[in-house]
């Protein structure tokens, strides 16, 4: 889970990242060593230019082989470069429709990449991200919702001007990234029998349902949660 998960063929045997495994043995600690080989600045810039939905990488994206087998870096399709750089790998294959599922190979790559991504979508620096994530974890586990919401505003209110497109999707991407970093059981836009909630977060002691409203009120969001049966 930490260092394995690489597959280069639908029927291929899973492979470990040898660099990370060797470093873990040397340090006698299950750390995050992937980013010692370099930071994906170019890839993140490519993602920004293409306006690629980061949630697809987090949840796993289904594509044809042609979607990730190109060797050119194109802003309209950053997936080949992301795949060839080792940040996503083959996670599944449906032979009936010839669709591949691509996703992060393991937790080391997932959390390392998303942690590096935060400053590109918010004004929260890379050094500050870990601090806020730790605080988020404490606040949700203790049920301190007010403190959690105040801290979440730091990520939303500090969105750089050139990225502030005032769409629910953009804010939801930030939220999705934050909670993936938390390592919580997290699903975005979870569908229920009568609709879908924007986000549902499960902790050991509580379930939090989030409904995003840029132009609406909190009362309207709560009413929608009740009426559509998100709980």
PLM feature segments, named:
Residues 1-5, 213, 231:
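Short intrinsically disordered, low-complexity coil segments enriched in acidic
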Residues 1-23:
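Amphipathic alpha-helical segments of the small helical/lid subdomains adjacent to P-loop NTPase cores
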Residues 16, 21-223, 227-229:
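Extended alpha-helical interface modules used as scaffolds for assembling large macromolecular complexes
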């Amino acid at each position: 889970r930490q260092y394995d998960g690489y597959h280069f063929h639908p029927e291929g045997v899973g492979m470990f990242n040898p660099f990370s495994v060797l470093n873990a043995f040397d340090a006698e600690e299950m750390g995050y060593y992937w980013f010692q080989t370099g930071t994906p600045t170019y890839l993140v810039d490519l993602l920004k230019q293409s306006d690629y939905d980061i949630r697809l990488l987090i949840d796993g994206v289904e594509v044809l082989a042609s979607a990730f087998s190109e060797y050119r870096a194109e802003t309209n399709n950053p997936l080949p470069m992301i795949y060839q750089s080792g940040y996503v790998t083959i996670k599944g294959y449906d032979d009936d429709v010839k669709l591949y599922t691509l996703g992060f190979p393991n937790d080391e790559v997932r959390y390392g990449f998303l942690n590096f991504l935060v400053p590109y979508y918010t004004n929260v620096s890379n050094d500050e991200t870990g601090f806020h994530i730790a605080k988020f974890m404490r606040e949700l586990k203790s049920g301190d919702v007010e403190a959690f919401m105040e801290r979440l505003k730091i990520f939303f209110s500090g969105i750089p001007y050139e990225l502030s497109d005032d769409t629910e999707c953009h804010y939801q991407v930030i939220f999705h990234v934050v909670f993936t970093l938390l390592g919580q059981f997290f699903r975005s836009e979870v569908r229920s029998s009568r609709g879908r909630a924007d986000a549902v977060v499960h902790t050991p002691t509580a379930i939090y349902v989030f409904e995003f409203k840029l132009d609406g009120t909190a009362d309207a969001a709560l009413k929608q949660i009740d009426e559509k049966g998100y709980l």
